[in-house]
Design a protein with these regions (language model features):
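A generic structural motif
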Residues: 13-16, 29, 189
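Intrinsically disordered, low-complexity, charged/polar segments
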Residues: 47-190
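Short acidic/glycine-enriched loop/turn segments that link adjacent beta-strands
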Residues: 19-20, 35
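Short coil-to-beta transition motif at edge beta-strands of beta-rich domains
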Residues: 2-15
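Short beta-strand-centered aromatic/proline hotspots
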Residues: 20-30
Length: 190
């Protein structure tokens, strides 16, 4: 017999990418034809080595999603009201938000966006702000003798030959790099 979520329910699930537990809250449940159909799920800004305890419910906060190109907003979506295997009910508390969403998902999620957001929050704030600013910028920079937008996301040394990997700092949004040869300072991290 399937277990259905109720508004206010808080669930924990093991996030295999984080190797920790994460949590979500059901903020509302919609019925269709007299049956629970959709649960609105809100990701919570919580992670731990063991499942959340009922005593911790009062301290929970929503997880805002703003990693990379996302504009800051609540990380929430609608999915089936049937609670999937692996999700453990911790308790029930008043929904943390009253907003609704028009985002739908085919399942409760595997925690990938939560993982990406929590990893994003580990990046120093100065770097995150530089990324966000560059992503929206029309500014250009000179690189390898050519002019490029500072928001450049990918680069290949096949088309843009350069000597020193430190030159890549010109592109705060660079997230894909294809190299065919060794470049000076490739392993320097700062």
């Amino acid at each position: 017999m399937p277990m259905y979520a109720d508004a206010g329910d808080v669930y924990c699930v093991y996030n295999f990418r984080l190797k920790q537990y994460t949590a979500c809250q059901v903020t509302r449940v919609e019925e269709h034809g007299g049956k629970k159909a959709y649960a609105t799920l809100l990701a919570l800004d919580w992670q731990g080595n063991k499942p959340l305890g009922a005593a911790e419910l009062a301290d929970l906060k929503p997880l805002y999603k703003d990693f990379m190109y996302w504009e800051r907003g609540l990380h929430m979506y609608k999915a089936s009201a049937v609670v999937p295997t692996g999700y453990v009910r911790v308790g029930n508390t008043a929904p943390l938000v009253g907003e609704d969403t028009q985002r739908y998902a085919s399942f409760w999620g595997d925690g990938y966006d939560v993982y990406r957001q929590l990893r994003w929050q580990q990046i120093p704030e100065k770097q995150r702000k530089a990324f966000k600013k560059a992503a929206k910028s029309k500014k250009t920079v000179m690189f390898a003798g050519r002019e490029y937008g500072i928001s450049k996301q990918n680069l290949s040394d096949v088309w843009d030959d350069f000597e020193d990997a430190m030159e890549l700092k010109a592109f705060p949004c660079l997230s894909s790099l294809f190299l065919t040869k060794w470049h000076k300072n490739l392993y320097i991290v700062d």
